[in-house]
From Swiss-Prot:
Protein name in the entry: Uncharacterized protein UL13
An example Gene Ontology CC term for this record: host cell mitochondrion
Subunit composition and interactions: Interacts with host MICOS complex subunits IMMT and CHCHD3.
Biased composition (Gly residues): 243-253
Biased composition, class Pro residues, residue ranges: 155-165
The family this protein is said to belong to: Belongs to the HHV-5 UL13 protein family.
Subcellular location per the Swiss-Prot or TrEMBL entry: Host mitochondrion
Superkingdom of source: Viruses
Primary location group: host cell
Region annotated Disordered, chain positions: 105-124, 142-201, 232-253, 327-437
Name of the gene this protein is made from: UL13
Ranges of Basic and acidic residues composition bias in the record: 168-197, 341-397
Species per Swiss-Prot/TrEMBL record: Human cytomegalovirus (strain AD169)
Amino acid sequence: MLWAHCGRFLRYHLLPLLLCRLPFLLLFQRPQWAHGLDIVEEDEWLREIQGATYQLSIVRQAMQHAGFQVRAASVMTRRNAVDLDRPPLWSGSLPHLPVYDVRSPRPLRPPSSQHHAVSPELPSRDGIRWQYQELQYLVEEQRRRNQSRNAIPRPSFPPPDPPSQPAEDARDADAERTESPHSAESTVRHDASENAVRRRHERRRYNALTVRSRDSLLLTRIRFSNQRCFGRGRLRHPAGSGPNTGGPRPGGAGLRQLRQQLTVRWQLFRLRCHGWTQQVSSQIRTRWEESNVVSQTATRVRTWFVERTTFWRRTWVPRQNPAAEAQELAVIPPAPTVLRQNEEPRQQLTGEETRNSTHTQREEVEDVSREGAREGNDGSRASGNDERRNNAGRYDDDHEVQEPQVTYPAGQGELNRRSQEENEEGGPCESPPMTTNTLTVACPPREPPHRALFRLCLGLWVSSYLVRRPMTI
């Protein structure tokens, strides 16, 4: 019992005391450990410390005499007790001394369901800089309006071209026009939100930026641009709206094109505000492609180039590549060779075949004797792999369809064959054609990769000139 008490006393009282005193003991016994770099004599070191302490005390007394208070404050104290209306003592309390408020922001509270979360934050929360930029725009806009109001309207000379559209779309007077029901349906006329709540008989304040803060500067900006496009004082033939985009002089686009352009821009702006996904844009693009705008020439040119580029198409891997098993191959896989016992396999084997190669050799050597029997009942004996390696039989009605017999006049076939042999100069193959039990397979030489790449890029580049491009979103 006594021993337990002693242990507890040691653990709770003596040990912390020792640990508190220990660093100082160590320091003062080994003064050369005080700084890691220079070794100072003990008495010199003590003198230095005492001098520093003395100077500090002098400074502290002087500050207290001048009315300064030096005390440590916690973070919360600093945060709560700084009152900017009545600057504290340590700022010097003279009016010309600036007071810098250094407060760390509050750490974020964890989200809770009890409190209202602002999500997402408005751009105006970024505050002054953003509003300042918007104001720059609005001031500029106002200046432009006033200038154009005072300007003497210059006559357009020569008179603009007659509109290419039917007369319904050409009606463009200063009066607000009454629209036929057809054009009223087709026009997208967007009434942007007003400044304040709309009241019935109240004349609206046309140039007000904000009234009772009903909308942000951003909405005001949208409203101004909308008034410039659709309002009463709108520009009739804005610059950049024509076939040669020279402004009102060279003859502008018809109203229908102009309206379409404006509508498209407006919709794009709405899309950007709303945010859209990859999925939406691909839907738009496929709808565009389905509506037959791609010129057929471009598609055919591109197809021609891509089909002749063999390099990236996959070579045959047994049950990995269904396109290869349908025999749309860059390199046609050679049919299995009949081997004699002492002969090395000449063809290069793929993964699965390499695994079974010895077994296959043994089996095929045995099969040479029964070859006639095997050809008789081929369907019963052939495994899946054999069918896949068999170059004939792409369609199951192949045995019913004969090759068309080409008939030449007398001796012409022989002449054709001879000239073909002379042109080929020893055959089309890099490797000699392998004679198998089925048929002779000649692998076409592979195109070197840089040639293939060049050919593909060239094709895509050429065909891109023949396409009428979609609107990119």
